[in-house]
């Protein structure tokens, strides 16, 4: 009798089928667990590699400390920087450098002229005093011939006179509008001219005489301009008429041009200053000046005539 049996897999499998695994069947549940763990570990590794914190570049940046300015141990010759170079220059060298730059670049020179402050009277007198000191230092010691002394002093003396004549237009109208400033400069400049040597040979005296002539014209220009403002009242009240008279006396009468301008400007204040032979600004003539009469309240009062 035939017995119907359910089909069963053969007891022995083909020798080549021992390594074949069915895709629908897994070997064991532990195999799936290990596979999932391995995949998860791989994914975690990928995520860590994708993270900016775990990147080598980020770690190297975090380890870097802020850089400090460290002087190089290697000594290399190099020129000074501009600020350090300027610190080494004295005023004379600095002026020389600036003059050369302005000569090569006129626009820079004009910018310096426009930006520099106006020179004060004290500053101008200080520069002239330096030239005067150089002239005095050139005078030889002991008894020397006039010719030798003149040629020793000629260069610094000429430099002094040239500087004085160059500074003078700065303080003349219309460049200088304040009469007092102009007169203060010329007062100091005239004193410097007084100190120039009086050479024994007549042919060497032209330097000083020319300087007197130029400064006298400058005085006259300022006096005439001041006379247009208040009739020259500031000249008399400031005592400049007396100052000029003293300069005229010290110069030996070489300030005639300035004295004539002053006499014309203050003639209405000092009657008899020229009629009685007295110079304007003398104390005796001040007694009859209109200004003093106005100040004392006697202007216009009747004048007594006769012995009583």
Swiss-Prot record:
InterPro entries: Cut8/Sts1_fam, Cut8/Sts1_sf. Residues 48-61 have a biased composition (Low complexity). Keywords: Cytoplasm, Nucleus, Protein transport, Transport. Residues 1-75, 269-290 are annotated as: Disordered. GO terms for biological process: nuclear protein quality control by the ubiquitin-proteasome system; proteasome localization; protein transport. Involved in ubiquitin-mediated protein degradation. Regulatory factor in the ubiquitin/proteasome pathway that controls the turnover of proteasome substrates. Targets proteasomes to the nucleus and facilitates the degradation of nuclear proteins. Belongs to the cut8/STS1 family. This is Tethering factor for nuclear proteasome STS1.
């Amino acid at each position: 009798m035939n017995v119907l049996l359910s089909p069963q897999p053969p007891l022995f499998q083909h020798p080549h089928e021992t390594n074949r695994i069915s895709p629908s069947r897994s070997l064991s549940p532990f195999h799936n667990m290990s596979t999932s763990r391995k995949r998860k570990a791989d994914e975690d590794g990928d995520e860590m590699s994708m993270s900016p914190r775990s990147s080598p570049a980020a770690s190297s940046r975090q380890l870097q400390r802020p850089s400090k300015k460290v002087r190089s141990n290697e000594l290399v010759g190099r020129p000074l920087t501009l600020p350090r170079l300027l610190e080494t220059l004295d005023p004379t060298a600095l002026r020389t450098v600036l003059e050369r730059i302005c000569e090569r670049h006129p626009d820079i020179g004009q910018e310096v002229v426009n930006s520099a402050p106006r020179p004060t009277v004290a500053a101008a007198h200080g520069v002239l005093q330096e030239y005067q000191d150089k002239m005095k230092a050139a005078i030889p010691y002991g008894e020397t011939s006039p010719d030798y002394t003149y040629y020793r002093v000629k260069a610094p003396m000429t430099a002094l006179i040239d500087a004085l004549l160059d500074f003078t237009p700065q303080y003349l109208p219309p460049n200088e509008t304040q009469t007092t400033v102009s007169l203060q400069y010329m007062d100091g400049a005239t004193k410097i001219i007084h100190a120039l040597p009086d050479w024994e040979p007549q042919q060497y005296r032209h330097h000083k005489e020319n300087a007197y002539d130029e400064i006298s014209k400058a005085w006259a220009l300022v006096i005439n301009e001041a006379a247009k403002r208040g009739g020259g009242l500031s000249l008399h009240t400031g005592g400049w008429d007396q100052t000029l008279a003293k300069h005229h006396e010290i110069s030996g009468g070489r300030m005639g041009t300035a004295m004539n301008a002053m006499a014309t400007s203050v003639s209405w204040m000092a009657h008899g200053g020229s009629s009685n032979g007295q110079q304007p600004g003398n104390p005796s003539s001040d007694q009859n000046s209109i200004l003093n009469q106005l100040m004392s309240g006697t202007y216009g009062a009747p004048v007594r005539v006769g012995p009583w």
